[in-house]
Amino acid sequence: MGGTFDPIHYGHLVAASEVAHMFELDEVMFVPSGQPWQKGRHVSAAEDRYLMTVIATASNPRFSVSRVDIDRTGPTYTRDTVHDLHALNPDSELYFITGADALASILSWQGWDELFDLARFVGVSRPGYELGQEHITGVMGELPADALTLVEIPALAISSTDCRQRVEQRQPLWYLMPDGVVQYVFKRRLYRGPHGVAGTGRLTTPSLVVGNNT
């Protein structure tokens, strides 16, 4: 499962678990973004986001964490992520799992036309959005039926934005994310800066999930 994970929370974990079950995936790889190119806000340091993701996923044997985006220089583009994962797992079928709201903007992503040749897409519901055909426009509506699946994730009402704001406002994080991540956030004093985050000034991309099956 990929994205900024700033911070990772139970919404990410539930989405990954539900999609893994639905598509009988052997593994869900969480891929923290390195230097994302799209969202216009500051994010926490890549190593902090990577370590929080490792802590959050450690207890699930089906979950793993990849450094493929963090270790790549330059901005993080989904096309590069999927290409690299294909190279590392040439015999696997990849699934690109993202928020349903992000599907409407996918045509603006660099190399979007290559993505459907590399992976199947799964759009999951996110806070404040309803699944529907309005998320699929233009070229996307002409794709083969199995190229894109919409999935509603139960009780997916937690967001990273809310978690950051709760820290800034000195509100509790318990039960919104694994205990180890809560402890890491406070030990590292994350999300207490002027923008509600501590980090390197890098920008973020839409959340995504990449998994594979046999």
Swiss-Prot record:
GO molecular function: ATP binding; nicotinate-nucleotide adenylyltransferase activity
Catalytic activity, reaction form: nicotinate beta-D-ribonucleotide + ATP + H(+) = deamido-NAD(+) + diphosphate
Domain of life (superkingdom): Bacteria
One of the protein's GO biological processes: NAD biosynthetic process
Pathway in which the depicted protein is active: Cofactor biosynthesis; NAD(+) biosynthesis; deamido-NAD(+) from nicotinate D-ribonucleotide: step 1/1
Pfam family, one: CTP_transf_like
UniProt keyword terms in alphabetical order: ATP-binding, NAD, Nucleotide-binding, Nucleotidyltransferase, Pyridine nucleotide biosynthesis, Transferase
Keyword Nucleotidyltransferase: yes
Listed EC numbers: 2.7.7.18
Keyword Lipoprotein found: no
Annotated InterPro entries: Cyt_trans-like, NadD/NMNAT, Rossmann-like_a/b/a_fold
Enzyme class: transferase
Function summary: Catalyzes the reversible adenylation of nicotinate mononucleotide (NaMN) to nicotinic acid adenine dinucleotide (NaAD).
Family statement drawn from the similarity comment of this UniProt entry: Belongs to the NadD family.
Name of the protein described by the UniProt record: Probable nicotinate-nucleotide adenylyltransferase
Organism from which the protein derives: Mycobacterium leprae (strain TN)
Gene: nadD
